Amino acid sequence: MDNVRTALITGASSGIGASLAVAVAASGVTLHLSGRNSTRLEAVAQTCRGRGGIVTTTTLDVRDADAMAAWIGSAGHLDLVIANAGISGRSRDGGAECWNLARAIFETNLGGVLNTVLPAMAVMAEQLPGAGGVRGRIAVISSIAAFMAAPDSAAYCASKAAVDRWIVASAHEARQRGIVLTSVCPGFIRTAMTADYRFPMPGLMDADRAAHVILRGVTAGRGRVVFPWWMGLAARLAGLLPSRVMAAVASRHR
């Protein structure tokens, strides 16, 4: 990304976040990376430094609003912010999700995004506009799951739907302030999160390739990046199915 000199990425210690950090890293680019695993985060930072990047790392939980606001506020000028941190979870044996699991998913996937995007927008709104009047770009990692309602992943689907709709709905007003918002809805990505899945994952993609697709869409200023496109279409069609049909399909892959 030629116009990015400073970037901030959450959930950068593994998976898509790590691949995005490495993809953005280049000579003269400053990266502010956060994650919960300090050892893995430092390993990613070292890789980015090897590509010429200037890297700072912070170990924190995106659910901590005060810590997030302080971290983002201390970063200085921000060209690109990627709210990537997220978790998943599935109910066991077709039962309802426990309260603790559902709450953790919403607090991380939705609350964590709010704790990232809102402070970042405040910082960017004070920056001088660049090419095309853009003050900064913010991408949020949602999921193709946002378009459907998987019975055994209710909180995950709902949390990803919430952030997708929020970003898409906020994009016009944000653009008037010089801030470009992008909702990213990937399909299955080969990460630690999907390693334990025991069901078919059509279109499974490497995290490095996914990072390339994401950054290409963000650079183009797209409001929503959905890939693979055919998975996005399939998810939207699945979202039209009666709940009993979705439940029957899910039960076959437990």
Region roles according to the model:
Residues S143:
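Residue(s) in the substrate-gating loop at a strand-loop-helix junction
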Residues S13-S14:
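Conserved glycine-rich cofactor-binding loop
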Residues S88-R103, E126-A131, D152:
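Conserved mid-core segment of classical short-chain dehydrogenase/reductases
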Residues S183, F199-L233:
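C-terminal helical subdomain
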Residues V117, S159:
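Active-site helix of classical SDR
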Residues M148, A169-V180:
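Active-site-adjacent segment of SDR/Rossmann-fold oxidoreductases
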Residues V29-V44:
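Conserved glycine-rich Rossmann-like NAD(P)H-binding loop of the short-chain dehydrogenase/reductase
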